[in-house]
């Protein structure tokens, strides 16, 4: 009976030798070693994957930054072009160099002070007109119409509120002060309730106006000034 286990052991050893089957302990140790190797390889690969992800994220951020910067420059360029359209001589030249961003800024810096001066002059002019209106509210309207091309004759129409009976005589005096000869005159009542009367004068100028001068406007302003002075004296 004791020889039977020995016999089985020898048979098992013979089978292992012939079939190259390793012992069970060896198989367990080998599987454990392979598992450890796979885990270590997986750990070594993970940092590489993180590096790839970081590089891809950095490239995406750079592309996004470049796109935003490109859009910002396009909007800025469009703003410069819009600013250039406000300049008076924008349509007179199609040169791209002239209307580049630096040139537009230079032109704007030069143009704005001119506008400020014009605004100042117009403001003073408005103040003078308001003052004249305050001092002589009875004058409603005045117009001067040139007759023919000679420049010697004109029709002056003055509409004002009749304050006294000698208003017509005062207007004749104003015409004479301006160097005008009255050829004919007429009056017409426009508004009876407000006592507004229109005086029409066909006048002739003693001297021919200088060519190129807006003498009609000058004459109109001079007549208005004379009327204001007469009103102030009263």
UniProtKB/Swiss-Prot annotation:
InterPro entries for this protein: bHLH_dom (IPR011598), HLH_DNA-bd_sf (IPR036638), MASH1/Ascl1a-like (IPR015660)
Key word Transcription present: yes
Gene Ontology molecular function: any one: DNA binding
Domain of life: Eukaryota
SMART domains found in the cross-reference section: HLH (SM00353)
GO cellular component, one term: nucleus
Family annotation (Pfam families): HLH
Composition-biased stretches (Basic and acidic residues): 27-37
Occurrences of domain bHLH (ranges): 60-115
Compositional bias annotation for Polar residues: 1-13
Alphabetized UniProt keyword annotations: DNA-binding, Nucleus, Transcription, Transcription regulation
Chain residue ranges for the region called Disordered: 1-67
Cross-referenced PROSITE patterns: BHLH
Subcellular localization: Nucleus
Record GO biological process: cellular response to copper ion; regulation of DNA-templated transcription; regulation of transcription by RNA polymerase II
SUPFAM superfamilies membership: HLH, helix-loop-helix DNA-binding domain
Presence of the UniProt keyword Nucleus in the record: yes
Similarity-based family: Belongs to the bHLH protein family.
Protein name: Transcription factor bHLH160
Organism: Arabidopsis thaliana (Mouse-ear cress)
């Amino acid at each position: 009976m004791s020889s039977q286990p020995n016999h089985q052991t020898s048979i098992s050893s013979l089978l292992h030798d012939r079939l190259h089957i390793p012992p069970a302990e060896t198989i367990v140790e080998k599987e454990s070693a392979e598992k450890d190797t796979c885990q270590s390889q997986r750990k070594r690969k993970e940092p590489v994957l993180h590096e790839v992800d970081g590089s891809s994220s950095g490239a995406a951020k750079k592309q996004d930054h470049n796109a935003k910067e490109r859009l910002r420059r396009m909007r800025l360029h469009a703003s410069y072009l819009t600013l250039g359209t406000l300049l008076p001589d924008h349509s007179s030249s199609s040169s791209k160099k002239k209307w580049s961003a630096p040139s537009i800024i230079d032109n704007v810096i030069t143009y704005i002070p001119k506008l400020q001066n014009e605004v100042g002059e117009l403001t003073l002019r408005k103040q003078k007109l308001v003052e004249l209106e305050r001092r002589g509210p009875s004058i409603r309207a005045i117009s001067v119409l040139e007759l023919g091309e000679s420049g010697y004759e004109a029709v002056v129409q003055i509409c004002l509120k009749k304050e006294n009976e000698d208003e017509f005589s005062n207007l004749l005096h104003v015409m004479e002060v301006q160097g005008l000869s009255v050829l004919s005159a007429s009056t017409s009542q426009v508004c009876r309730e407000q006592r507004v009367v229109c005086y029409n004068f066909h006048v002739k100028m003693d001297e021919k106006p200088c060519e190129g001068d807006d003498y009609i406007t000058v004459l109109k302003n001079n007549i208005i000034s004379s009327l204001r002075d007469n009103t102030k004296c009263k």
